[in-house]
Swiss-Prot record:
It is a peripheral membrane protein. It comes from Thermobifida fusca (strain YX). Belongs to the complex I 20 kDa subunit family. The gene is nuoB. It is found in: Cell membrane. Its cofactor is [4Fe-4S] cluster. NDH-1 is composed of 14 different subunits. Subunits NuoB, C, D, E, F, and G constitute the peripheral sector of the complex. It catalyses: a quinone + NADH + 5 H(+)(in) = a quinol + NAD(+) + 4 H(+)(out). This is NADH-quinone oxidoreductase subunit B. One of its GO terms (cellular component) is respiratory chain complex I.
Length: 185
């Protein structure tokens, strides 16, 4: 006497969104965007000690067209910002971004005119990972938190609306240099 015998054939006890969420979270391919010392810790997470493959990330993708997760590890210069945006735009939907380290999250410990003060001014960020540099264990924890977010992601029109809201929020955010200029006026 199992559940299958009690229910008529063809009955599914879950939603399509839950199935799709499970499949997406267990088969992510990250595109690496390592720019500084955080990239060393990201590479360590791919090694046998931390084994990122057990979470469905069998390989890091060298091409953005085959990736659905971008891990920005390190500081982004003003000249590198358009390249980052181009790579993000080339990624297939749905796509997620982890800002790994203080430099990617907020520009680092120095307010430098040549450094973007947080990659969220360029691309919408889903998970911010603090640390200088964050340990591989922290990256794995951030990936697990992202898995929870992916599991509960809406599909179709609801996802498009969510992406549009994130993009509008990103466009409204001023870079730190412009915030400083406005404060001195």
């Amino acid at each position: 006497m199992g559940l299958e015998e009690k229910l008529p054939s063809g009955v599914l006890l879950t939603t399509v969104e839950q199935i799709v969420g499970f499949v997406r979270k267990t088969s992510m391919w990250p595109a690496t965007f390592g720019l500084a010392c955080c990239a060393i810790e990201m590479m360590a997470a791919g090694g046998p000690r931390f084994d990122i493959a057990r979470f469905g990330m069998e390989r890091f993708s060298a091409t953005p067209r085959q990736a659905d997760l971008m891990i920005v590890a390190g500081r982004v210069s003003q000249k590198m910002a358009p390249v980052l945006r181009t790579i993000y735009d080339q990624m297939a939907e749905p796509k997620w971004v982890i800002a790994m380290g203080v430099c990617a999250s907020s520009g680092g410990m120095f307010n430098n005119y040549a450094i973007v003060q947080g990659v969220d001014h360029i691309v919408p960020v889903d998970i911010y990972l603090p640390g200088c540099p964050p340990r591989p264990e922290m990256l794995l924890d951030a990936i697990l938190k992202l898995h929870d977010k992916v599991q509960n992601t809406k599909l179709g029109v609801h996802r498009e609306r969510e992406i549009e809201e994130l993009e509008q929020r990103r466009l409204r955010a001023l870079p730190l240099i412009q915030q400083t200029e406005e404060a001195t006026r």
